[in-house]
C-alpha cells in the first residue's frame, strides 16, 4: 500500500495538469451520475406516497383510433361503473370544472389583505378514502357538512401559526361560484412534490354533475380489492361503457374500451 501511494504521489508530481484534469473529470462525472439517479428515483417514485398506491387505478376511456387515454368521465356513468364490479373497493372523483389552482384565502377577522394563495378543489367524499388522506387534526367524517373544508398542514401554519385551525373559518375573495367562507374540519399531511394530488383546500363536490351525462370534467380513481383481477374488472364494466357509447355513435359501440391504469403507469403514459 505504501508503495502504491508513493507511486501515485510521484505520478501526480510529474503530471500535475493531467492529474487535476482527471480528478475534475471524475468529480463531474460522479456528480452528474448522482443527479441523474436522484431524478430517476424521483420519477419512479411518482404517486407512490399514498397508502395502497399499488391498488389505485384511474378509470380511462381508450380512444379506438389512436390508443390515447381519456382521463375524464361523465359523473353519472362513472358512479354506475363503481357499483358494477365486485373487485372495486371504493372510488371517487375530482371536478375540473369547479376547481381553481390559485385562490386567495384569508381569515375573515384579518381581511383580504392578509390572503395567501392556495389551490381549491371540489372532490367526492370517497376521494379522500381512495388516496388515504392522513389527518393530523380534526375529523374527515365532517367533510360533507355544509361549507366544510380540509386544508394541508403547510397552509394551516401560514394562516394560523401555532393555533389549532380546526373549527376556524377561512374565506376566499368574493366573485367565486362557491360559498365565500368555509369551516375547517380537518388538517391533512401535505403530499410530496412527486404526487399528482396537490396540497389544496378541499371541499365536498356533493351532488354536482350527478345528472349530467354530457359533462366530462371529472377524473375518477378507484381502489381495487387485494389481489383483484384488473382485466376481469374491465370486462365487468364494459357493458355499461358500450351502452353509454351507443347513445352517441351506434357504429362504434363495440370499439369503445375502458382501461384501469395504475397511478405510476398513468404518469408515464
Predicted regions and their residues:
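Short, glycine-/polar-rich solvent-exposed loops and beta-turns at beta-strand/coil boundaries
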Residues: 140-144
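Glycine-centered tight turns that cap/initiate beta-strands
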Residues: 17, 86-90, 164
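Membrane-proximal extracellular/periplasmic loop immediately following the first transmembrane helix
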Residues: 36-104, 114, 209-210, 215-223, ...
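Mid-to-C-terminal secondary-structure elements
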Residues: 121-137, 147-269
Amino acid at each position: 500500500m505504501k508503495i502504491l501511494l508513493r507511486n501515485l504521489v510521484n505520478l501526480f508530481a510529474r503530471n500535475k495538469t493531467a492529474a487535476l484534469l482527471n480528478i475534475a473529470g471524475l468529480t463531474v462525472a460522479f456528480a452528474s451520475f448522482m443527479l441523474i439517479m436522484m431524478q430517476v428515483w424521483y420519477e419512479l417514485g411518482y404517486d407512490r406516497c399514498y397508502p395502497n398506491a399499488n391498488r389505485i387505478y384511474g378509470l380511462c376511456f381508450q380512444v379506438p383510433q389512436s390508443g390515447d387515454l381519456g382521463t375524464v368521465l361523465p359523473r353519472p356513468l362513472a358512479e354506475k361503473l363503481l357499483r358494477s364490479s365486485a373487485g372495486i373497493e371504493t372510488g371517487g372523483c375530482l371536478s375540473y370544472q369547479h376547481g381553481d389552482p390559485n385562490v386567495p384565502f384569508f381569515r375573515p377577522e384579518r381581511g383580504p389583505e392578509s390572503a395567501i394563495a392556495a389551490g381549491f378543489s371540489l372532490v367526492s367524499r370517497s376521494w379522500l378514502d381512495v388516496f388515504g388522506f392522513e389527518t393530523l387534526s380534526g375529523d374527515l367524517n365532517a367533510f360533507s357538512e355544509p361549507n366544510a373544508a380540509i386544508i394541508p398542514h403547510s397552509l394551516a401554519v401560514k394562516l394560523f401559526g401555532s393555533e389549532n385551525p380546526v373549527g376556524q373559518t377561512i374565506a376566499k375573495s368574493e366573485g367565486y361560484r362557491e360559498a365565500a367562507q368555509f369551516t375547517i374540519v380537518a388538517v391533512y399531511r401535505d403530499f410530496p412534490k412527486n404526487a399528482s394530488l396537490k396540497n389544496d383546500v378541499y371541499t365536498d363536490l356533493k351532488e354536482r354533475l350527478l345528472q349530467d351525462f354530457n359533462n366530462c370534467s371529472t377524473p375518477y380513481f378507484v381502489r381495487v380489492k387485494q389481489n383483484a383481477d384488473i382485466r376481469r374488472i374491465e370486462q365487468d364494466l364494459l357493458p355499461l361503457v358500450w351502452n353509454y357509447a351507443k347513445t352517441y355513435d351506434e357504429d362504434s359501440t363495440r370499439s369503445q374500451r375502458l382501461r384501469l391504469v395504475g397511478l405510476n403507469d398513468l404518469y408515464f403514459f
